[in-house]
Amino acid sequence: MKKIVLLRHGESAWNKENRFTGWTDVDLTEKGVAEAEKAGVTLREYGFNFDKAYTSYLKRAVKTLNCVLDKMNLDWIPVEKSWRLNEKHYGDLQGLNKAETAEKYGEEQVLIWRRSYDIAPNPLSESDLRNPRFDYRYHEVSDAELPRTESLKDTIDRIMPYWESDIFPALKDAHTLLVVAHGNSLRGIIKHLKHISDEDIIKLNLPTAVPYVFEFDENLNVANDYFLGNPEEIRKLMEAVANQGKKK
């Protein structure tokens, strides 16, 4: 049975500080590295091998992938990076503490910014140095395609062309693929694969560095999906993600 494993990056510095990260290129914490290495060990122990891996342009995802492949002795497999797998762009919220923002604007407003389907935060200005137009890694991406902010819908609209043109077609000639990305970019893929409604997708909270496996039948329809790990531990990790946008 063919498989695609989705993996959110390990804890980043701004995950630890409970900040809106988006396209800001922050590194993994020591805990994040350990989480990524644990994911690699878990995948190896469950007998997984990957034919190809995909990740974003952001170092927290790239380094997570490197840790996983190292622990699996799969450093040699082909890896494809795409800006389309980047996290949702949080606009002018990037860098702000989520709990402090909830104190200022209310938990409901922060939940809307974090989890609503089609409402985006305020955009970055054209002169803001956080604007991706100033980042050389995106010099081959047209200015019209680079976001200044995004809703989850915008994020999915960015990701799905790449999913449809590159990742999913590769499954025809491969047995197992690995996608290491971000909470919201992976949420978009999961929404597509499981046909989750716009209303229900905002309730999905992905923990860091816990492998999420999708199995496909001979017609490449989803046959099964599951997390690898202790169900109770995973439930607690999901609750922790859900609580990030609440007041202190």
From Swiss-Prot:
Catalytic reaction equation(s): (2R)-2-phosphoglycerate = (2R)-3-phosphoglycerate
EC number: 5.4.2.11
Positions of the record's site feature: Transition state stabilizer: H182
Pfam family, one: His_Phos_1
Active site: H9 (tele-phosphohistidine intermediate), E87 (proton donor/acceptor)
Pathway: Carbohydrate degradation; glycolysis; pyruvate from D-glyceraldehyde 3-phosphate: step 3/5
Major enzyme class: isomerase
Key words, A-Z: Gluconeogenesis, Glycolysis, Isomerase
InterPro entries to which the protein is assigned, alphabetical: His_Pase_superF_clade-1, His_PPase_superfam, PG/BPGM_mutase_AS, Phosphogly_mut1
Chain sites annotated for binding substrate: 8-15, 21-22, 60, 87-90, 98, 114-115, 183-184
GO molecular function: phosphoglycerate mutase activity
NCBIfam families: pgm_1, PRK14115.1
Annotated family: Belongs to the phosphoglycerate mutase family. BPG-dependent PGAM subfamily.
Role: Catalyzes the interconversion of 2-phosphoglycerate and 3-phosphoglycerate.
Protein name, per record: 2,3-bisphosphoglycerate-dependent phosphoglycerate mutase 2
Gene symbol of the encoding locus: gpmA2
